[in-house]
Amino acid sequence: MAGLKDVVTREYTINMHKRLHGVSFKKRAPKAVKEIKKFAKLHMGTEDVRLAPELNQEIWKRGVKGVAFRLRLRISRKRNEEENAKNPLFSYVEPVFVASAKGLQTTVVEEDA
């Protein structure tokens, strides 16, 4: 459990194509948002997952049915500074703009504090 207590930032490549296979056209972008939240919850172990507005723009930029096959994401586990917060940690997901997301591995990003 000690591993979940620390603040960390990692970059992931998430294959949206396999997560959205078989989803009807008008539900693809909303399903992509839900799948990204589910992915962040699984990999960071936090209930509270927040998406950056830029990520929402990236998902929706080609319309409701044109979600990119792969997305490169930077997921940060941060401390919740609010007073009576339900969860002590939350995950913040933002996009990483790369030419191609193919073949990239998961990396730990060193934060500049």
Swiss-Prot record:
Family matches, as CDD domains: Ribosomal_L31e
Disulfide pairings: none
Keywords in alphabetical order: Ribonucleoprotein, Ribosomal protein
Protein name in the entry: Large ribosomal subunit protein eL31
One Gene Ontology biological process: cytoplasmic translation
Claim: RNA-binding is one of the keywords in the record: no
SMART domains attached to this UniProt entry: Ribosomal_L31e
CC terms in the record's Gene Ontology section: cytosolic large ribosomal subunit; fungal biofilm matrix; preribosome
